[in-house]
């Protein structure tokens, strides 16, 4: 693991060095390598594809502007980039919580789009999407600290150490938040009658 991490750190440092020198291909490689992960994280916090896309773009603008601050001695590129992403996404989430907007029309349009999607089993796809939406609604009800840890561990599949590095909190705190978040999510889903209890 140490050798793999060292290799990842060296590769990330080299990509950043090339970007700083004006190599567009290096920047494109960074974006292609990490954009899906950033988008997934943004989507888990926003539950909206358009907002997640906007946040993903914002993250990469910030990353590009912050390349001079990247120091491979403090961790690999992925951890640094995902820490920037997490901070920006959490900040956006907090702003939206303070100033909620009426998004019913947008949600209705999304629903119409999903109903038009074709497939062999429309019913099964609708059930899968509904279950996914219900689970996401349950995740949205968790406190920010619990939600962040649950998303990073159970959805983004980061290791405990990666979460520790990303959030800069002790491993015991990470494990506690994940456990409490899972328990709370199960209670929420039972109340929503998503799972039997």
Locate predicted features.
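N-terminal module of bacterial RNA polymerase sigma factors
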Residues: 1-37, 123, 140, 187, ...
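Acidic, proline/glycine-rich intrinsically disordered inter-domain spacer in sigma factors
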Residues: 2-3, 10, 110-137
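Short, charged helix-capping/linker segments at alpha-helix termini
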Residues: 3-6, 20-29, 39-58, 69, ...
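Amphipathic, Lys/Arg- and hydrophobic-enriched alpha-helical face
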Residues: 31-49, 66, 82, 139, ...
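Σ70-family region 2.3-2.4 aromatic/basic alpha-helix that recognizes the −10 promoter
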Residues: 35, 43, 57-64, 74-95
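Arg/Lys-rich amphipathic alpha helix in sigma70-family domain 2
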Residues: 65-69, 83-104, 180, 191
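Short, basic/polar amphipathic helix motif occurring as a linker/hinge flanking DNA-binding modules
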Residues: 92-114, 126, 196-197
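Helix-turn-helix DNA-binding module
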Residues: 133-173
């Amino acid at each position: 693991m140490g050798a793999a991490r060292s290799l990842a750190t060296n590769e990330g440092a080299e990509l950043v060095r090339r970007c700083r020198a004006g190599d567009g291909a290096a920047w494109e490689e960074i974006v292609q390598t990490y954009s899906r992960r950033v988008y997934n994280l943004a989507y888990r916090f926003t539950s909206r594809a358009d907002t997640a896309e906007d946040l993903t773009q914002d993250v990469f603008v910030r990353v590009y502007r912050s390349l001079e601050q990247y120091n491979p001695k403090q961790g690999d590129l992925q951890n640094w980039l995902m820490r920037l992403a997490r901070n920006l996404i959490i900040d956006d989430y907090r702003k939206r919580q303070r100033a909620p907007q009426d998004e019913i029309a947008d949600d209705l349009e999304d629903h119409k789009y999903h109903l038009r999607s074709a497939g062999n089993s429309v019913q099964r796809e609708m059930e899968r999407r509904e279950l996914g939406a219900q689970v996401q609604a349950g995740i949205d009800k968790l406190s920010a600290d619990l939600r962040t840890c649950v998303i990073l561990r159970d959805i983004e599949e980061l290791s405990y150490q990666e979460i520790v590095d990303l959030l800069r909190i002790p491993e015991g705190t990470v494990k506690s938040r994940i456990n409490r978040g899972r328990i709370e999510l199960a209670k929420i889903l039972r109340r929503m009658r998503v799972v039997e209890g």
